């Protein structure tokens, strides 16, 4: 009996000690939470009773080289409702439905939805947002927001790009420089009770947004507008599929204008600019993607005779041809078992290398290519930078489509030498020729010039790589001299302007499949010929009627230069120039 009582007493003591230990543990834990972790749990408690709303940052502007605003912001509003704070739901539904022109049923679904905050509509005009505020509706929040606005509409649309509903860049410079432009959003913090209702008198805490930086570009509104008008005019006159024109500084790669007509309205980028406006679903998205493409860098094409500039430079640099070399053109050249024709089927007869360039004679350049051989030609293809992308500051640049060197026989070499059987982008051609005529420096084409703060203070200057020595200074001078005679005496006469020395090269190439009757007409020109400050490349896709580049593309560049050269401060230095009469006999 006594033993049993002692045994139970021990059990009681054990239980008592366990309870004491648990109590001490709880007290210790409580002390730890109230002292050591007090700040942490205080913050957690605040978070439970704070509602957070974003304040969007103003996106940075995009400027042209002279400070004209190409992309800006308009103040709009975002209208939201907080279910727990609404005291008169019917009034809220009625007012919002009328002000926002939205059916009451749609508003009701969102008003009656139990959630911390429900967005009713974004991109609401500020005047409408202000009108809703005047009703002072409990549970309705009207926050200011920003919507991207493009003052010049369709100008440089495929360069600038546009933003989506979240104000983030989708294409063009808007997406390339998104990190620079987007800024940092702010916050609005309000205190609520356990039901989620804001507590009167507590006010709100704000973390102000930081506006995005401004991007200054090399584009010039005046040049871009004129070039876009010239492109639209020739597209209409020749009933062409599309027209692309590049205008850049061959010395440093700054792009003055980049036009691809038809362009699209940047303020309404999801509306098609074609006749298929009723397209829906995947078909519409495909058409939109095509509308947004920038053919100057997203698409490749056979450059045709403008590529003879590259063959010319390689041949002169390697020493396999000189300006005094003589050639004979019977209207074709036989390579292996293939007869490859000249543009002039009756032939140019005896001519010098310079005259061959003036006449854009295929057999002459085939001969230069064969003298080089596939290994050396491929070496220069690589040396000139044609096997790598230009590095332009836009997304989606396409690469060169070229023969594998192991499969490059004499026939392939012959056709490549005058710009066929491979494909490059227009920006690649313009960049490569720039490097050849500027003294041998492979520059990087670009639009971005500098980053500035919202108040206009320069943050940094954007820099781009330059690769020197792709050709010698002597070769560069010789190429410029030859190409000046192409305009003053040869197939590029229609680009000549009284008083200006202009160099250039015409081109006319067939689209695939051969024999389809579809052509690409182009002209590449630069001025002044002795010290180039501006280079232009005009490409007309599928023109109707006369399709020679020297007849339809060269005059476009002439009209652009007539306005742009004086605008850029380039003076007339030549006393005599070609008459500019049309040359249709065997020209490219």
What spans do the regions from the language model cover?
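Periplasmic/cell-envelope proteins involved in peptidoglycan metabolism and beta-lactam response
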Residues: 1-276, 300, 375-387, 396, ...
């Amino acid at each position: 009996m006594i033993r049993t009582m002692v045994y139970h007493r021990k059990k009681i003591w054990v239980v008592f000690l366990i309870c004491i230990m648990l109590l001490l543990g709880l007290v210790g834990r409580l002390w730890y939470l109230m002292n050591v972790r007090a700040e942490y749990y205080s913050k957690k408690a605040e978070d439970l009773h704070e509602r957070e709303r974003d304040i969007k940052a103003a996106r940075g502007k995009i400027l042209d080289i002279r400070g004209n605003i190409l992309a800006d912001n308009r103040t709009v509003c975002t209208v939201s409702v907080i279910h727990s704070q609404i005291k008169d739901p019917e009034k809220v539904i009625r007012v919002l439905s009328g002000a926002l022109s939205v059916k009451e049923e749609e508003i009701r679904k969102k008003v009656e939805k139990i959630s911390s905050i429900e967005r009713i509509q974004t991109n609401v005009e500020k005047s409408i947002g202000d009108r809703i505020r005047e009703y002072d509706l409990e549970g309705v929040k009207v926050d200011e927001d920003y919507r991207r606005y493009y003052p010049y509409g369709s100008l440089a649309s495929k360069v600038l790009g546009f933003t989506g509903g979240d104000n983030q860049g989708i294409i063009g410079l808007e997406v390339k420089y998104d990190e620079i432009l987007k800024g940092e959003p702010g916050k609005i913090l309000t205190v609520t009770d356990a039901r989620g209702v804001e507590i009167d008198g507590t006010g709100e805490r704000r973390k102000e947004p930081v506006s995005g930086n401004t991007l200054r570009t090399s584009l010039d509104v005046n040049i871009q507008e004129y070039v876009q008008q010239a492109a639209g005019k020739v597209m209409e006159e020749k009933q062409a599929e599309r027209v692309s024109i590049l205008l850049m500084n061959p010395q440093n790669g700054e792009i003055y204008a980049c036009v691809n007509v038809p362009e699209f309205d940047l303020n309404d980028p999801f509306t098609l600019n074609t006749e298929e406006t009723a397209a829906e679903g995947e078909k519409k998205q495909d058409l939109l993607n095509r509308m947004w493409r920038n053919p100057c860098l997203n698409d490749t094409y056979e450059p045709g005779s403008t590529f003879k500039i590259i063959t010319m430079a390689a041949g002169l640099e390697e020493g396999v041809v000189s300006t005094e070399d003589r050639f004979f053109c019977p209207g074709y050249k036989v390579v292996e078992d293939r007869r490859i024709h000249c543009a002039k089927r009756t032939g140019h007869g005896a001519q010098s290398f310079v005259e061959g360039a003036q006449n854009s004679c295929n057999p002459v350049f085939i001969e230069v290519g064969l003298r080089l051989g596939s290994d050396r030609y491929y070496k220069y293809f690589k040396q000139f930078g044609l096997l790598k992308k230009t590095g332009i500051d836009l997304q989606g640049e396409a690469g060169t489509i070229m023969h594998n060197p192991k499969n490059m026989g004499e026939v392939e070499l012959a056709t490549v030498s005058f710009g066929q059987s491979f494909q490059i982008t227009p920006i690649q051609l313009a960049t490569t020729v720039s490097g050849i005529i500027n003294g041998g420096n492979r520059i990087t084409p670009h639009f971005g010039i500098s980053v500035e703060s919202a108040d206009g203070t320069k943050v940094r200057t954007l820099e781009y790589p330059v690769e020197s020595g792709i050709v010698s200074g002597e070769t560069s001078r010789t190429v410029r001299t030859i190409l000046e005679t192409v305009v003053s005496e040869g197939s590029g006469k229609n680009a000549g302007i009284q008083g200006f020395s202009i160099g250039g090269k015409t081109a006319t190439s067939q689209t695939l499949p051969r024999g389809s009757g579809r052509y690409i007409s182009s002209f590449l020109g630069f001025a002044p010929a002795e010290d180039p400050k501006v280079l232009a490349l005009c490409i007309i896709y599928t023109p109707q009627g006369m399709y020679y580049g020297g007849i339809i593309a060269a005059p476009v560049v002439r009209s652009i230069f007539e306005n742009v050269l004086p605008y850029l401060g380039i003076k007339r230095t030549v006393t005599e120039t070609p008459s500019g009469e049309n040359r249709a006999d065997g020209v490219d």
